[in-house]
Amino acid sequence: MSDLKPFVAKVAAREALSRDDARAAFEIIMSGAATPSQIGGFLMALRVRGETVDEIVGAVGAMRARMLHVKAPDGSIDIVGTGGDGAGTYNISTLAALIVAGAGVPVAKHGNRALSSKSGTADALSCLGVNLEIGPEAISRCIGEAGLGFMFAQQHHSAMRHVGPTRVELGTRTIFNLLGPLANPAGVRQQLVGVYAPQWVDPLAEVLRDLGSESVWVVHGEGLDEITTTGVTKVAALKDGTITNFELTPADFGLERVTLDALKGGDGAHNAAALQAVLDGAENAYRDISLANAAASLMIAGRAKDLMEGMDLARKSLSSGAAKVALQRLITVSNAA
């Protein structure tokens, strides 16, 4: 079938799609056979009715089948959020990724430019001088030599060109916010995944379990698709097929609570300058929340036995300059491609 309309009608009637039907629908979208109106109608019908685990797994299958793959070392991790939380914070996962890389865990980071916010990972890294327009071999070199490689979503998911304009015009969250973190081109099995709403914490952990992930935390922190320092973070931790639920507070990281205003960022240039300032030694709320997310990532990757050890390793990555060196090497290696 190459017609999306029957699937639009089914979802609009509040019927759930099977994994096979969901995969077929998203293959139609990614092949370019659907019109922008059909895509927009389908995405919004899914959102209003609510996406199911089977629909997400099927959609991810369609994305993964078409993506451009990257080789990464065993034990690599991704630190990624769905976006779409509307909070306008700094690029927290980006700084956390540099801290983790500086602590010696390879990071295969997947991200994009801002679609429904002011600054995505790609916007900040581009402003810092990282070359985003590089191929899989060069990204693998970045991971090997800098400890961090950035996989620009539009480079690795070229089929998304059929969806991008519609997503921008809609200007709101869709299932594609959920799919991005699930379709890492390096096939990482360890991730810290932030989701834009608390109701997605458990379902995405289930999806990742079904997709074969090994060690993952899916988190939501009081409106943020990150571990937050503003209050309570909900966590679904997947380890070897078992999902455990718990909550975290800033005190679990040895941190004080802050207001959301303390975490507000700006555009790519603004956030890049703030990130560089932390690498240069600034101590502020942006640093602290990034340390918390890095600490959790180090625990997920098995480098730290608990969050406090993760915080110690993360702080050393900053204080020793290792995180800053990771960025400098990423800039150098990416521009030598």
Swiss-Prot record:
Segments traversing the membrane: none
UniProt binding sites for anthranilate 2: 167
Keywords: Amino-acid biosynthesis, Aromatic amino acid biosynthesis, Glycosyltransferase, Magnesium, Metal-binding, Transferase, Tryptophan biosynthesis
Amino-acid biosynthesis recorded as keyword: yes
Positions with a binding annotation for anthranilate 1: 81, 112
Biochemical pathway: Amino-acid biosynthesis; L-tryptophan biosynthesis; L-tryptophan from chorismate: step 2/5
GO MF terms, alphabetically ordered: anthranilate phosphoribosyltransferase activity; magnesium ion binding
Residues holding Mg(2+) 1: 93, 226
Domain of life: Bacteria
Known EC number: 2.4.2.18
EC main group: transferase
Residues annotated to bind 5-phospho-alpha-D-ribose 1-diphosphate: 81, 84-85, 89, 91-94, 109-117, 121
Biological processes, Gene Ontology terms: L-tryptophan biosynthetic process
Co-factor(s): Mg(2+)
InterPro entries registered for this protein in UniProt: Anthranilate_Pribosyl_Tfrase, Glycosyl_Trfase_fam3, Glycosyl_Trfase_fam3_N_dom, Glycosyl_Trfase_fam3_N_dom_sf, Nuc_phospho_transferase
GO cellular component, one term: cytosol
Binding site for Mg(2+) 2: 225-226
Any matching Pfam family: Glycos_transf_3
Cofactor binding, per record: Binds 2 magnesium ions per monomer.
Family: Belongs to the anthranilate phosphoribosyltransferase family.
Assembly information from the UniProt record: Homodimer.
Name the record gives this protein: Anthranilate phosphoribosyltransferase
UniProt organism field: Sinorhizobium medicae (strain WSM419) (Ensifer medicae)
